[in-house]
């Protein structure tokens, strides 16, 4: 079966493959980040989002893989074979987990649309011949925000008065503005 773990999130394995292998932090760093940012949501019995569910599954699978690696390390007698298994897990499976964890943590942090826009931008940048592309790759945190997190209820935006607007307003107008900002 050819299963793409990013399909339902609007991305693909191929889209993530444009990022170099050393782009992704270590699994340990990603697990620490997920724990620091999303521990309550990940441990909650409530469903939060598909990204939380995917993160939970990836974390559980990584734990099982580490249990297997520990067992192999303790039970495989041949040091050369043991080293081959450890290297395979770290290089191949480790990269897949690093990509998966990075994707879902980034989607929860920046928003799915921003992450996909970043992946597309980076893919275009990396495939553009060096002579025709800007010297610096796109950076996820500098992309324009597409999602805005707001508290429940609406609070009006503070606006700077335009130069054409008179500075003095009637007291009645001021009171209504202050009443709105308290909501």
Curated annotation (Swiss-Prot):
Task: Give the residue ranges for region: 3 X 8 AA repeats of S-P-R-R-R-[PR]-S-Q.
Answer: 155-177
Q: Which InterPro entries match?
A: Hepatitis_core, Viral_capsid_core_dom_sf_HBV
For this UniProt entry, what's an example GO CC term?
A: T=4 icosahedral viral capsid
**What domain of life does the native source organism fall in?**
Viruses
Q: Where is this motif: Bipartite nuclear localization signal?
A: 158-175
Record region (Disordered): 143-183
Q: Which residues carry this modification: Phosphoserine?
A: 155, 162, 170
Q: Where is this region: RNA binding?
A: 177-183
**Modifications made to the protein after synthesis:** Phosphorylated by host SRPK1, SRPK2, and maybe protein kinase C or GAPDH. Phosphorylation is critical for pregenomic RNA packaging. Protein kinase C phosphorylation is stimulated by HBx protein and may play a role in transport of the viral genome to the nucleus at the late step during the viral replication cycle.
The UniProt entry, under Gene3D superfamilies, shows: Viral capsid, core domain supefamily, Hepatitis B virus
| Keyword line | Capsid protein, Cytoplasmic inwards viral transport, DNA-binding, Host cytoplasm, Host-virus interaction, Microtubular inwards viral transport, Phosphoprotein, Repeat, RNA-binding, T=4 icosahedral capsid protein, Viral penetration into host nucleus, Virion, Virus entry into host cell
Keyword check for RNA-binding, yes or no: yes
- Give its localization: Virion; Host cytoplasm
Where does it mainly reside? virion
SUPFAM superfamilies per the record? Hepatitis B viral capsid (hbcag) (SSF47852)
Identify a single GO molecular function assigned to this protein.
RNA binding
Report quaternary structure and partners: Homodimerizes, then multimerizes. Interacts with cytosol exposed regions of viral L glycoprotein present in the reticulum-to-Golgi compartment. Interacts with human FLNB. Phosphorylated form interacts with host importin alpha; this interaction depends on the exposure of the NLS, which itself depends upon genome maturation and/or phosphorylation of the capsid protein. Interacts with host NUP153.
Role played = Self assembles to form an icosahedral capsid. Most capsids appear to be large particles with an icosahedral symmetry of T=4 and consist of 240 copies of capsid protein, though a fraction forms smaller T=3 particles consisting of 180 capsid proteins. Entering capsids are transported along microtubules to the nucleus. Phosphorylation of the capsid is thought to induce exposure of nuclear localization signal in the C-terminal portion of the capsid protein that allows binding to the nuclear pore complex via the importin (karyopherin-) alpha and beta.
State the family named in the UniProt similarity comment for this chain.
Belongs to the orthohepadnavirus core antigen family.
The name on file for this protein is Capsid protein
* Organism lineage: Viruses, Riboviria, Pararnavirae, Artverviricota, Revtraviricetes
